[in-house]
């Protein structure tokens, strides 16, 4: 949790906001009751950080949470559990777009690891790390992301994994 007034300090100090989106849809079950509704306005405040120019870095926090990055992508897009609750999402003003979410999982994570000059985006001269999936993430509804299958993983330009048919 962060107070809205403290977000500018992240920008001024060049800090990274590193979070796991899946935590938001787990913590929403108890956060209001335990922490108070006014305090949780700044829980997983991705939009506040992004709008202030703070670097976001996302991960899965496996094995504590589900290892699939698509679960985290779904959480960042919807702020809802797998059943679609609550309607509209928990603190929906903090939801992100798919572009923003994927960037936080890739370029943002590389930046947080001080490795953004080597990986995190597809660009000549950087490592070619690619995940090929079974659907166009930009053309499916968020709940469909939960069933995404990895077909191939390429690390530094070489095939590291291929799904069996």
Give, region by region, the residue ranges found by the protein language model.
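His/Asp/Glu-enriched, well-ordered alpha-helical/loop segment
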Residues: 4-138, 143, 148, 152-156
